[in-house]
Curated annotation (Swiss-Prot):
Origin organism lineage: Bacteria, Bacillati, Cyanobacteriota, Cyanophyceae, Synechococcales
One of the record's GO cellular component terms: plasma membrane-derived thylakoid membrane
NCBIfam families reported for this sequence: ATPsyn_F1gamma (TIGR01146), PRK05621.1-2 (NF004145)
This protein's UniProt keywords: ATP synthesis, CF(1), Hydrogen ion transport, Ion transport, Membrane, Thylakoid, Transport
Membrane topology: Peripheral membrane protein
Source organism (scientific name): Prochlorococcus marinus (strain MIT 9301)
CDD domains given in the database record: F1-ATPase_gamma
InterPro entries: ATP_synth_F1_ATPase_gsu, ATP_synth_F1_gsu
TM helices/strands, residue ranges: none
Family: Belongs to the ATPase gamma chain family.
GO molecular function: ATP binding; proton-transporting ATP synthase activity, rotational mechanism
Subcellular location: Cellular thylakoid membrane
Protein purpose: Produces ATP from ADP in the presence of a proton gradient across the membrane. The gamma chain is believed to be important in regulating ATPase activity and the flow of protons through the CF(0) complex.
Descriptive protein name: ATP synthase gamma chain
UniProt key word Membrane: yes
Record gene name: atpG
Amino acid sequence: MANLKEIRDRIVSVKNTRKITEAMRLVAAAKVRRAQDQVLKSRPFADKLARVLENIQSRVQFEAVDSPLLSKREVKSISLVCITADRGLCGGYNTNIIKKVEIRYAELVKQGYQPNLILVGKKAIGYFQNRKDRYVIKSTFKELEQVPTVKDSEGVTNEILAEFLSENSDRVEIIYTKFITLVSCAPVVQTLLPLDPQGIAEENDEIFRLTTKDSKLLVEKSNIEKSDSEKLPSDIVFEQSPDQLLDSLLPLYLQNQVLRALQESAASELACRMTAMNNASDNAKELASTLNLTYNKARQAAITQEILEVVGGSVV
C-alpha cells in the first residue's frame, strides 16, 4: 500500500484536476448558449432567402436557367469539405467526423471518382496531412471563431466556388457534425454543389437552451415553428433576368449553408466538450472519494500498528 504522503498528494492532484474540468464545463456551457443564440439570429435571413428562392422557382423553371451553380455535369472529381475543431478535449467529436470522412473518401475512390479534401480545423489538418500519400488535400482553414460568423464562412465559400466554377470539382459535399441535442450529435454528409434550393429547411428544428436551477444546469427544449411562405404576386415583373437574380442570390444561399454547417459543428463541439468535462469531473469526484477511503484505511492501519508497538513495548 502506498504511504500516506503519496496518497495525500494524489488526492490534492485529483481535486485540482476536478476544478479545472469543472471550469471548462461551465465555459463550454456558456459558449453553447452563445452558439445557439447565433444560430437563432441568423435564421430570419436564411429563412427569407430560402422563401425568395422557392418563389422564384415557382415562377421560373431552374432547368431553363443558365446558372453555373445549378448546372449538373458528368461527375469525375468531388471535393469533400471536412469540418473539425481546432482543439481537443471534446470526447469523440473529432474522431467521429474524421472516420466519416475516411469512409466517404474510400467510397468515392471505389466508385471511380477522384475525391479531394478541403479541411477546416486543426484536428483534420493535422490528421490528413500526416497521410498525404493516401489523401489529396486542396486547401485548409484553421483558427476560426468558436462562434462562427459570416466572415468565417466567406473564405470556405469562396474556395468551394472557385473549385466548382473552374470545374476542378464537379460536385462538392460537406461533412460536418449535426447538432441534435446537448448529449447527442452525428456526422452528416450534405451536397452543397450543384445547388438544390428545395432541399433546405430549418423549420421544426429543436433548440436546446441551457438554464440553471438550484445551481445546476438544466436543458429546456423548444421547437421552431414553421414559417408561412410569402408568395410573390403573380403579376410581379423582375427588372433583372432570372439568370442575374440567381447569380446574385445563389452565392448568398451557398454561404448561408456553409455558415449553418459551421455553426452546427461549433455547437456540437461545445456540447461534446461540456459532456466530456462533466464526465471527467464526475470521475475525478469518484476517484477522490476512493482515494480518501484508501487514505483513511492506511492512516487507521498506521495508528493501529503504532498502538500495537506501544503495547508490545510496555509488556516487555
